[in-house]
Each structure stands twice: as structure tokens, then as C-alpha cells.
């Protein structure tokens, strides 16, 4: 299946480990992993950033194989989950950056077009998250208040 607004096919992906169980060389307990996830979330890191730090610095290849649940589910259990889903947050952040660029460069027609594409992705994703009840049904993306969502 192709990408939404580009020519790419999206074939490349990271290789998941074959075994779903925790590695034998890993001596970290699930409670330690939970505590470190909560510690990183309180610092303001996103779930994907937490996963990268745990993989690179702490030697935990996959949180789900150690704890039995994913990072976002652990954050929800402790009440630390972000109010806006991460992918929607990054799209809003990108739209705010493009709007800021367009304030300085009014004649940049390509950026205007890209802003339309990004905002259509935001609306499509918001519709999905409202349907799956990850966003409240009255939530609405507005370009005027978007910078307060990201700040």
C-alpha cells in the first residue's frame, strides 16, 4: 500500500525479534521497567522516546516482552498518558511550524500546499481517534489554537 501524499511505498521497517519472551540475559524486573517508564514520562518524554532510551541506554529490547504490556498502556495505568495521541501531536506541531514559516514567507506556494496536506491528515486522524474514543467527541482542530496545544 502506498503513502497518502507522496510516491513512497513504505516497505522498510525494523525487524522484530522472533521470540516474544524476555531475553535470558536481561536481569531487569518488570517493576524496574515500570518505574523507569514513569520516571521518563514525568520528565516529559513521549512513549516512543521512552522506548528508544530503554532500548539504547538500558538494554531493554522490547518493553512488552519484559512487562507484558506496552509503554502507553503502562502510562495510562499510572495516569501519565498524553491527552493527545503522539502521532496527532506531531502532525499539529508540523502544521504550526509551517504556519510560522508562512507568516514570514507569504509567497511560498509549496508550503501552502503542504500545509493543506498536513491539515487534511490531522482531520482524518482526529476523525479516527474520535471514532475509537481516544479523543473526546467535541475535540476539534483549529489552526488559531493549535500553537497552545503544542506549547
UniProtKB/Swiss-Prot annotation:
InterPro entries: Ribosomal_uS15, Ribosomal_uS15_arc_euk, Ribosomal_uS15_N, uS15_NS1_RNA-bd_sf. One of its GO terms (cellular component) is cytosolic ribosome. The keyword Chaperone does not apply. GO terms for molecular function: structural constituent of ribosome. One of its GO terms (biological process) is translation. The keyword Ribonucleoprotein applies. SUPFAM superfamilies: S15/NS1 RNA-binding domain. Keywords: Ribonucleoprotein, Ribosomal protein. Belongs to the universal ribosomal protein uS15 family. This is Small ribosomal subunit protein uS15z. It comes from Arabidopsis thaliana. The gene is RPS13A.
